[in-house]
UniProtKB/Swiss-Prot annotation:
Disordered: annotated segments: 91-118
GO molecular-function term, one example from the UniProt record: rRNA binding
The protein's name: Small ribosomal subunit protein uS13
Alphabetical list of SUPFAM superfamilies matching this protein: S13-like H2TH domain (SSF46946)
Family the entry assigns: Belongs to the universal ribosomal protein uS13 family.
Gene name tied to this protein: rpsM
Coiled-coil ranges (or none): none
Gene Ontology BP, a term: translation
Organism field: Pectobacterium atrosepticum (strain SCRI 1043 / ATCC BAA-672)
Taxonomy, superkingdom: Bacteria
Function per UniProt: Located at the top of the head of the 30S subunit, it contacts several helices of the 16S rRNA. In the 70S ribosome it contacts the 23S rRNA (bridge B1a) and protein L5 of the 50S subunit (bridge B1b), connecting the 2 subunits; these bridges are implicated in subunit movement. Contacts the tRNAs in the A and P-sites.
NCBIfam families noted in UniProt: uS13_bact
UniProt-listed PANTHER family: 30S RIBOSOMAL PROTEIN S13/40S RIBOSOMAL PROTEIN S18 (PTHR10871), SMALL RIBOSOMAL SUBUNIT PROTEIN US13M (PTHR10871:SF1)
Quaternary structure, from the entry: Part of the 30S ribosomal subunit. Forms a loose heterodimer with protein S19. Forms two bridges to the 50S subunit in the 70S ribosome.
């Protein structure tokens, strides 16, 4: 297994799909990485040479991924909550943040129904 950005990349998958296992790299960005490193998208990771894997590592290192990205997102949400913004309050209460309706639906965000006590 190749190790890129601290993640074990699955050998049996094509390069584009395997790179998406890194947090912060989606399909579009993985296609751009393959184009920049001149590696075919349909080649499996196990078929790549060590030099090609090093090229992939160098290209992925240019982006904010994995732990740094997770920390950035967490700090951004914490900042909103500390400022007391509307979005921060919605995060704190565990409700939808982007204007979705909550009279019905939003069960994923709100959690299971709580029975009304009589």
């Amino acid at each position: 297994m190749a190790r890129i950005a601290g993640i074990n990349i699955p050998d049996h998958k094509h390069t584009v799909i395997a790179l998406t296992s890194i947090f912060g790299i989606g399909k579009t960005r993985s296609q751009a990485i393959c184009a920049a490193t001149e590696i075919a998208e349909n080649v499996k990771i196990s078929e790549l040479s060590e030099e090609q894997i090093d090229k992939l590592r160098d290209e992925v290192a240019k982006f904010v991924v994995e732990g740094d990205l997770r920390r950035e997102v967490t700090l951004s949400i914490k900042r909103l909550m500390d400022l007391g913004t509307y979005r921060g309050l919605r995060h704190r209460r565990g409700l939808p943040v982007r204007g979705q309706r909550t009279k019905t639906n939003a069960r994923t965000r709100k959690g299971p129904r709580k029975p009304i006590k009589k």
